[in-house]
């Protein structure tokens, strides 16, 4: 069972998040990631289902960045290792043509065709002939706005 958000969320730090024995590994992926707009580098992604969320652990060199996507209601958060707590994401975006997902602008970007293909499979009507989807989250971590392609330019005005 994969949990996804609407669009991107529907479309995705040094974490010390342990994987409980009840966690189910969905997949592992060797891919490319970038932090804070830097050039992409090799990274490994592990997706695991847990009680009420899916965790995406991104191992980038010595750094581990974890994104949590939870359902009911859909929320996305990033683990803040210094504060030792989850921080709600402010925004996320996905570009289907490059299989790239970015969180909080370009704080973390990852090439992840596994996730985006599953988003397309689970939301064929919403994602048909779409390339870009952006999601904005409110202070409570819930989606408060989303847009596709040229509609994202309208939202910025």
Task: Tell what function each PLM region has.
Residues 9-16:
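Bacterial N-terminal signal peptides
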Residues 1-8:
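Bacterial N-terminal signal peptides that target proteins for export
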Residues 23-157:
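Cysteine-centric segments in proteins
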Residues 18-20:
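N-terminal signal peptide c-region/cleavage motif recognized by signal peptidases
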């Amino acid at each position: 069972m994969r949990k996804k958000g609407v669009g991107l969320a529907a479309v995705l730090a040094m974490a010390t998040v342990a994987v409980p024995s009840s966690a189910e590994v969905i997949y592992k992926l060797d891919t490319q990631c970038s932090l804070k707009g830097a050039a992409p580098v090799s990274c490994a992604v592990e997706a695991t289902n847990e009680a009420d969320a899916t965790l995406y652990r991104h191992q980038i060199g010595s750094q581990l960045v974890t994104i949590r996507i939870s359902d009911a209601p859909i929320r996305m958060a990033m683990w803040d290792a210094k504060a030792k707590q989850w921080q709600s994401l402010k925004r996320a975006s996905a570009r289907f043509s490059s299989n790239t997902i970015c969180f909080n602008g370009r704080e973390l970007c990852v090439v992840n065709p596994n996730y985006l293909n599953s988003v397309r499979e689970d939301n064929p009507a919403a994602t048909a002939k779409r390339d870009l989807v952006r999601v904005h989250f409110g202070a409570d971590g819930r989606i408060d706005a989303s847009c596709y392609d040229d509609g994202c330019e309208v939202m910025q005005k």
